[in-house]
């Protein structure tokens, strides 16, 4: 079969195929893949907030809980609680759902 006969079919496949850039941008990422994607593709040298949980913290959700009450040192506790919530959003959005690698709100 002559190659020129297949060219229109190839052109249709290219036009109707998915946009490769768009297919790469939205992905399910978990664990080390999420960390690498945030570091290499999104945040770079700025870095991002990430503290992996130990097995004990995963098994016992009360470990590391912070109260947001007033009192001495409450400002640092509130900051810690907000950072933990921020990390939870990263994991929730990129592991359970689909996250966009263009979203830089995960960066420091």
Curated annotation (Swiss-Prot):
Keyword annotations of the record: Carbohydrate metabolism, Cleavage on pair of basic residues, Disulfide bond, Glucose metabolism, Hormone, Secreted, Signal
Signal peptide extent: 1-23
GO terms for cellular component: extracellular space
InterPro entries in UniProt: Insulin, Insulin-like, Insulin-like_sf
SMART domains cross-referenced by the UniProt entry: IlGF
Subcellular location, principal: secreted
GO biological process, one term: glucose homeostasis
Cellular compartment(s): Secreted
GO molecular function, one term: hormone activity
Keyword GTP-binding part of the UniProt annotation: no
Gene3D superfamilies recorded: Insulin-like
CDD domains (UniProt xref): IlGF_insulin_like
Domain of life: Eukaryota
Keyword Signal included in the entry's annotation: yes
Record-annotated disulphide pairs: 30-94, 43-107
Residues that make up the propeptide removed upon maturation: 57-88
Family: Belongs to the insulin family.
Record text on subunit structure and interactions: Heterodimer of a B chain and an A chain linked by two disulfide bonds.
Protein role: Insulin decreases blood glucose concentration. It increases cell permeability to monosaccharides, amino acids and fatty acids. It accelerates glycolysis, the pentose phosphate cycle, and glycogen synthesis in liver.
Protein name: Insulin
């Amino acid at each position: 079969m002559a190659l020129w006969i297949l060219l229109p079919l190839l052109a249709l496949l290219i036009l109707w195929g998915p946009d490769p850039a768009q297919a790469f941008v939205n992905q399910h990422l978990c664990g080390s893949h999420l960390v690498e994607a945030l570091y290499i593709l999104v945040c770079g040298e700025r870095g991002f907030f990430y503290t992996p949980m130990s097995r004990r913290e995963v098994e016992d959700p009360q470990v590391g809980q912070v109260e947001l009450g007033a009192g001495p040192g409450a400002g640092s506790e509130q900051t810690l609680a907000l950072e933990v919530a921020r990390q939870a959003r990263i994991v929730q959005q990129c592991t359970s759902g689909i996250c966009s690698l263009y979203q830089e709100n995960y960066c420091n």
